[in-house]
Amino acid sequence: MNCLLKSFLVGLAGIQGVTLMAESRPKLVVGIMVDQLRTDYIENLRGMLSQGGFRRLMDNGVYFKDIDYMVPGGDAASASAVLQTGAYPRQNGVAGEKVFDPQSKSLKSVFHDDTYIGNFTNETYSPSSLRVTTFTDEIAVANKGKSKIHSISPNAAQAIVLAGHAGTSAFWINDETGRWSSSTYYSRPPVYLQNQNYNSPLISRLDTMRWMPLRKGEPYPDISSQESNSGFRHSFSRSDKDVFSLYKSSPYVNSDITQAAIEYVTGLGLGKEGEKTDVLNLGYNLNVYPAFSNDDYKFELQDAYLRLDKDLERLFNTLDREVGKDNVLLYLFSTGYFTEPKTDTETYKLPGGIFSVKRAVSLLNAFLVAKYGNGAFVDQYANGHIYLSKNLLEEKNLDPVKVAEESRDFLVKMSGVADAFTLADISSLAVSHLEAQRRAIDPKTAGDIILDFNPGWTVVDDSRYPSVNQDNKTTSYPGPGFIMGQGLSPQVIDETVEAVEIAPTLSRIMRIRSPNSATSKPLTLK
């Protein structure tokens, strides 16, 4: 009898423990992805940062100084997908924001889906291409679908990743109109951003925006006193065809996203209703302002960091006041890459050159025509991937593997090409040195030949209008990450941490299951 009673009490204690653990879960999870955030910049600016923004994360959170995504050629969407799913593009299906569509023979969003209609946009998107669950999805499952899950980002693909499959809403800024946009995939979009489109549209505010130094006349690190005193000034003209792109690369987009986030927290009751956990995921930008073509970008970039620091302080203060700091789990991570403007190679006599996509495709097609007869053998070039015409190869009864290998061997001889691989090369487990490439591609959307370019070379995609320039720079900059919440002690982790370890770690903190494609073990935190 005593044994039975003892067993019952142990079991009851276990049940109560589980209940207490569930009740002590955070009421609100706030996830922030900062595109191109660099550790060296926040460390260099530490003395100028406010106590309530980045410094609060650095001093009171778990501070990862180097998050490695382990894949080349990332962007905001693919990096967010790796961090949210704990899996690489090969598994999660998001190798980049744009993919080649063989039907239209053009680039489309990785999340293009004609099944749904756009809200305030002609774009038709859904998360159906995201093939695995996310950390956010698992929160929804653990809370039996009761969680409110919202995401806001300048970028459509990133907003969709951050909302996951179970998202209540996802909003982004339309590249053509500057409107806050969404998809009918999301059934309960908040009215705040919809009202902004009517009451305070971006197009009506652009002419009033003037970007000048936040601390004019004060010294900025590595900026001469003459530059600091003269400052800088950028305006946004509605007549500029690139005005929305410029806006989305300026600190103003971060401030607008912060204001929207604050309205969500105060107006939607996030983290205040019942015993469930709500989610608010945000995307911020710290990429180089597009107006620059050389090393003169550092003044503006440092200023963008200081402005984002103020935005974070404003957001954190709202969370403290509305939800309570002990009720919030907050994480902020860099996307782990940095796109620098091209250095003036001619002035400094540095190695480099220009790789013309149009010329390369034309030469490759001429080479294949000489071997196999007339036809357009190349369908498209996109981000280092060359897509051969499957229809033409089938029509001519050609072996696609052989043609891809011949194309690879032809392209690798071109100036500026460091190496070339077929999809079969990369997919072969026997080729160990291609492991990073293997992780980075989705075989369902990858090209037949993938090119690597020499550092210092500019890839000019002049096969489409307007042409797109991509500077090939292999220098790596550490990107930081932070996790802050009740029960986590401040600590600094200097060792490199793989991005795929973060979702399992966050899942352990939340005491929920990891995303279904995450195989890494959770990190042990204090």
Which residues are covered by each model-predicted region?
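Short, structured active-site-proximal loop/turn typified by the sulfatase FGly-forming signature C/S-X-P-X-R
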Residues: 43-92, 148-152
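His/Asp/Glu-rich, glycine-adjacent segments
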Residues: 88, 96-276, 285-292, 415, ...
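A long, amphipathic alpha-helix that forms part
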Residues: 41, 247-273, 287-328, 406, ...
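Substrate-binding rim/cap in mid-to-C-terminal beta-strand-loop elements of soluble/periplasmic
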Residues: 359-398, 467-510
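Secreted, luminal/periplasmic, and some membrane-associated catalytic domains
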Residues: 75, 97-123, 132, 137, ...
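Second-shell loop/turn segments in exported
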Residues: 38-44, 67-69, 121-127, 244-251, ...
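Short, solvent-exposed turn/loop segments enriched in Gly/Ser/Thr/Pro and often Arg
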Residues: 65-82, 151-160, 283-285, 334-336, ...
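Bacterial Sec-dependent N-terminal signal peptides
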Residues: 1-25
